[in-house]
Amino acid sequence: MIKKKHLEMMLDSLKRHPNPKADLEQYTIDGKLAADILFFAVNDFYNNVVIDLGCGTGRLAIGSKILGAKRAIGIDIDRESIEAAKENAKKLNVDVDFYCMDIRDVDDEFLNNVLGEDRDLKRVVIQNPPFGAQKKHADRVFLDKALEIGDIIYTIHNYPTKDFVIKYVEDKGGKITHIYEAFFRIPAIYEFHKKKVVEIPVVIFRIEKLGFETVFNFL
């Protein structure tokens, strides 16, 4: 397996959003945070399936494949993001299935058709959803879908929503096993940004679907 610093550099070399849209809260995750999350999650997704909901330019999906996911699927509603993601995967010679579609249309039938003989593998959702700053409750749409299709979920959220997410997931029948705090680096890309760079405190949750038992002790 490659070193985390090497993965960080590889991901940071990839194309960012070519035309980020504020209403979709499109922020490209920096290489360090992406690498940290992927190394945190690798025991879950190694030789299994990764589904990146709202994949943007594909950093999490591509990184997971580099670290040994058997299959990686990226879903995004924005066609420009998907085209950039495909370019990024090609640049690193990584095989990822990218689809331009609404995440609400992703279901077991779709995934079974995409995965074929790999349909019975563990499905790990790794997502960087919108925080809901531009569209209220946008984060809930992603949480609901992740809990529907994923066996294990890694999801990034704005730190002030930590208590809400914990209660929301538990009410939906999910089990939060690990919480990881970090900073999300955001450069000035929209007109309403006043500073060149800000670091937003975020929290990453590892969630198990009710009835799914992990088969290893997380370190």
Curated annotation (Swiss-Prot):
Name of a matching Pfam family: PrmA
Gene Ontology terms for molecular function: transferase activity
Superkingdom of source: Archaea
Coiled-coil parts of chain: none
Biological process, per Gene Ontology: biosynthetic process
Identification of the protein by name: Uncharacterized protein MJ0284
